[in-house]
Amino acid sequence: MRKPSSSAPVSRSVGRRTVLAAGAGAVAALGATATSARAATARPAARPVSLTITARPAAEAERLRLAQALRGSEFQPTGLYAPAGTPLSLTVQPCDGLVPTLWIGAWDYYGEITEPRSYPLTAGANTVTDPHGGPVYLTLTGHGERAEVKFRSGTVPMPVFTLGRTTEADYQHQLDTLTAAPWVELHAPNTIMTLSREGALLYRGEDHAALLRLVETIIDSHARISGLDGSKPVHRRKAGPYHFTEVSKVPTGVGAYATHGYNGFPRAYLDRATTVEGLRTRGWGLYHELGHLHQQMAYKPGGLTEVTVNIYSLAAQRTLDQPSNLLTVDPATGLTAFQTSRAKFGTAGLTYEKSFGAYEKLVPLRQLELAFGDDFWPRLHKLVREENPQSDYTENDKRYRALATYSSRIAGYDLTGFFVDTWAFPIDAVGRAELSALNLPQPPVDPSTLTD
């Protein structure tokens, strides 16, 4: 049974992170449309590569709209690699007045080079020389405006598999011939997966269309439990894809992590992130880290950072017809998390944060679904987006109160007994008064008695 991730403080410009313990023609599906052929393989591209990029809302604006804790990616991939110290020449034509930003490099929070470098562009000719090199991306902030970008020299094409466009044979040919770039990418409508060449070659025998369809299914499971059904503008999915990146290193005891803009996976995790069977049957870590990019801030006190994230992990398991991790039998006790947590109810000194283990803490969140329907969490996410209450990272009491009051409002019942008396959540006197003021009836069934 995989351990949950633990939060870590801000120490670099990418911001707060959470960690899990324990070519050019390929980019059309992601928003940038290529209009010229790939360049030669072994040296910076000799022929121009032209792209049309369409503007999207900024990642921070999307985070605020979705009431989430972390920003998602706003990168639009080009399928190109810029060698270190090589002048990159490109021309920009802003069709609708907006000029894109160029980014070069890979995300790698714990590595030597931690993040891509940004280069604001101007209309007309531009030359950029990046000291480190890396995959090339563009961003264009807006709402559907377009810009045309022509890469004239200074790049080489990366091997790229794009779902629905690239055949497996073509991708394998790219891996064999496009050897100048040390990076490889897999693209789908909601996915960018950036791998080192060595990492990609480890599992080159996989069915990459099936792999990307599976990743898209997992992303869809997270969107559905989040109530991102497009019923109102505020309930649209985030603009652009999610970015999964192979990283060079993680701290001892860390398996993978999530932070603003991407999920990071070391090579040791690729057997579960880039193989169909591994991701389908042992991919909890990816489900979990992607969940961090969906967590809403309003009801996520520090003590729940590694708990509410698994609302999304469980949703992925159900979507993939996996048995729930909450039903895993602890070999030491012979009991599931439902059973071991129930045995603690009513004991002296019981506190939610200190008395229950990682999976036991997840049990009450699952019991709310069992009691009040599969649409419980989608409805709660929607209400939080529509009201968008604000809280500072330090206001843990406020966010615990929000969890209890929003849950009671969605259920239509007073859940004081469930949260305070049974599970011993730290709901303060203000929170108990807020619950009382809702004037809701008692639930007909005690949710704490329910199990999968």
Task: Label each region the model flagged.
Residues 1-14, 24-30:
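N-terminal secretory signal peptides
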Residues 40-159:
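Beta-strand-enriched, solvent-exposed domains that form extended recognition/catalytic surfaces
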Residues 133, 137-225:
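Fold-level signature of zinc-dependent metallopeptidase catalytic domains
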Residues 18-38:
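N-terminal export signals
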Residues 182-371:
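Catalytic cores of extracellular degradative/oxidative enzymes
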Residues 318-327, 369-379, 408-418:
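Structural helix-adjacent loops and short alpha-helical linkers that scaffold large soluble proteins
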Residues 356-391, 395-401, 410:
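Active-site neighborhood of glycoside hydrolase catalytic domains
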Residues 2-3, 40-49, 399-452:
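Beta/coil-rich, acidic/histidine-enriched accessory regions frequently appended to metallopeptidases
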